Amino acid sequence: MGEDQRNLFIALGLILVILTGYQMFVMGPAEEERRAEQAAVEASQELADPDLPASALEPAAATTVDRETALGGNQRVTIDAPSVLGSLSLTGARLDDVRLRRHTETIDDDTPVALLNPIGSDHVFYARDGWTSATSGFTDLPGGSTEWTLASGSTLTPDTPITLTYDSPSGLHFERVISVDDNYLFTLTDTVTNNSGQEVELSRYGLVRHEGRPEDETRNMAVFEGALAVIDGAMVRSSFGKLEDGNQTEESGTGGWVGITQRYWMAAAVPDQDRPFTARFRTIERGEIDAFEASYVEQAIAVPAGESLASTTRIFAGAKELGVLQQVQNEVGIERFDMAINWGWLWFLTRPFVWLLTMLEGALGQFGLAILALTLMVKIVMFPLANRAYASMAKMKAVQPKMAEIKERYGADQQKQQQALMELYKTEKINPLAGCLPILPQIPIFFALYQTLFNAIEMRHAPFFGWIRDLSAADPTNIWNLFGLIPYDPTGIWLIGGVLGIGAWPIIMGLTMAAQQALNPPPPDPMQARIFAFLPIVFTFILAPFAAGLVIYWAWNNFLSVLQQYIIMRRHGNETQVDKLVARLLKRDRGD
């Protein structure tokens, strides 16, 4: 089994090296930041919206200004809720100023994360709701440029909803009641009264727009960022890259939602769950910057003259906290809303892992300890399989001298070598595959844990012991400046600085990986031996920029594997490199 297992590890190692190298050196280099500078765009230019009336269009900003200046451009209603603060623009009843109270921009700053930003500022991101009609003469319905009137209320809180009104020249009266819950969900209840004297068909729509790719876009295969939707229970999504390439999506169904998501945050527009709707993703070119849009349009409803229509939709703007998403899904009835989290193709593992991490964090009081506890639990569950693998490795290591003797005896005669080796396996009762097969089920578990930790918002700004203040950021220490003793930052060196950020935890991870390899049977091929000796160094550099929580998990997992493997090998009477090292140290102390 020795060679088979080594080949498996080599293959996995090389695959990981190739994938990580591709991510770092091909996908990683960020494109030059697309600023919201729009001097070339006429102030009167409007954002084309072919399926919506002219009243639904928003004028493009002629220039980019700071966020506070952009917020002062129109009348606003203050939002003050336990989870969000900000304001709502009366122009278009647009939700374009939302900051998240429970999440700060940086670990050293108590400034809330600014999720939604107004037109004219950097990183425009907003959500809104409107109406459209195919009936001739009704082109003045509520849209992006509509000026709503604040009829009642002054500040939007969970206890004090606000009421907006708008009277269209064509004879329709719109009343919109907006409320917000204790988390991130806004409810928009519209009542439309038809005073036009004729029947009119109305369709309600909702949209989320993001101008340009996010400044902090992750561009990692474990993270999905872009437009996504659930339609009839099925997930549909398109990344920012695909949208930028012109990929447009249109799907119809009943029940679901549309949104634009980033690693930790999402803004989503939610139609009436009982109304058929058509969802669409698209990219709208506007000057030097593109607008990415996820939208829906509900099926038209006929409203006779003199009658009214009631309709309720929702907008979610907040953090992708599992408990909040599940609460919205269960209490409000929004279909599969927890799919906003990128569970990956190993969802049947990542879902229980997230649940366990949440439970463990609550019990232990720290997310870092929850990672260690979950890793230990996985090790315990996988112990029977790992025990068989390590036991087989121990037996293989015990017969290494006999295998070397066979290879020396038969030299280049591969056929006789294989026959003699098979006879040896039979005599010693060794199954060459016994150590390889139990390892295979552990591979998806490792990748599922990686996916879980990379997307867990609970890890963001979560501290650990010692110098780790943020588990979602890279280890801040650096070996090249003696871990902060020398006032020098090598990561700023042009071209190579990115690979010089090697902190203490990546080094610990590399040492545990080397220790694990020392317990394995030595490769008979000198080239394989050199590759294995080099892999811990390679992985130390590769994992250096990774989130500290991931590196700590990997180091802890390696340590548990070393401990487990050492105990099993000693039970089989094998002397390990650790034993040899201890023996040499004791011999030196005795002066022998």
UniProtKB/Swiss-Prot annotation:
Example of a GO biological process term: protein insertion into membrane
Membrane topology qualifier: Multi-pass membrane protein
GO molecular function: membrane insertase activity
Compartments it resides in: Cell inner membrane
Domain of life where this protein originates: Bacteria
Pfam families, per database record: 60KD_IMP, YidC_periplas
Primary location: membrane
Annotated Gene Ontology cellular component terms: plasma membrane
Keywords per UniProt: Cell inner membrane, Cell membrane, Chaperone, Membrane, Protein transport, Transmembrane, Transmembrane helix, Transport
Membrane spanning stretches: 8-28, 363-385, 430-450, 493-513, 531-551
Database matches in HAMAP family: YidC_type1
Family, as annotated: Belongs to the OXA1/ALB3/YidC family. Type 1 subfamily.
Job of this protein: Required for the insertion and/or proper folding and/or complex formation of integral membrane proteins into the membrane. Involved in integration of membrane proteins that insert both dependently and independently of the Sec translocase complex, as well as at least some lipoproteins. Aids folding of multispanning membrane proteins.
Subunit structure: Interacts with the Sec translocase complex via SecD. Specifically interacts with transmembrane segments of nascent integral membrane proteins during membrane integration.
PANTHER family linked: CYTOCHROME C OXIDASE ASSEMBLY PROTEIN COX18, MITOCHONDRIAL, OXA1
Protein name: Membrane protein insertase YidC
Lineage: Bacteria, Pseudomonadati, Pseudomonadota, Alphaproteobacteria, Maricaulales
Gene: yidC
